[in-house]
Amino acid sequence: MGMRMMFTVFLLVVLATTVVSFPSDRASDGRNAAANDKASDVITLALKGCCSNPVCHLEHSNLCGRRR
């Protein structure tokens, strides 16, 4: 294989890898953003002591967890 042919193959591999990686990056960003929002809510409630308060825990059981 000549140098020009090897360079062409290299560029095709890089291009194919880049095109394949973009859709998966966009999909994971949405999931990560949703997980980060929920994590920030849990941290906020925990810092305020809400999860240790029975009444508040019942109102926000989706954020504090179902166990009590």
From Swiss-Prot:
One of its GO terms (cellular component) is extracellular region. The modification Cysteine amide is found at residue 64. It is found in: Secreted. One of its GO terms (molecular function) is acetylcholine receptor inhibitor activity. Changing residue 63 to A: 2.4-fold and 15-fold decrease in ability to inhibit alpha-6/alpha-3-beta-2-beta-3 and alpha-3-beta-2, respectively. The cysteine framework is I (CC-C-C). Alpha4/7 pattern. Coiled coil: none annotated. The keyword Signal applies. Alpha-conotoxins bind to the nicotinic acetylcholine receptors (nAChR) and inhibit them. This toxin blocks neuronal mammalian nAChRs (alpha-6/alpha-3-beta-2-beta-3 (0.39 nM) > alpha-3-beta-2/CHRNA3-CHRNB2 > alpha-3-beta-4/CHRNA3-CHRNB4 = alpha-4-beta-2/CHRNA4-CHRNB2). Also exhibits inhibition of D.melanogaster alpha-7/CHRNA7 nAChRs. In addition, inhibits alpha-6/alpha-3-beta-4 (CHRNA6/CHRNA3-CHRNB4) nAChR with a higher potency on human (IC(50)=1.49 nM) than on rat receptors (IC(50)=31.5 nM). This is Alpha-conotoxin MII.
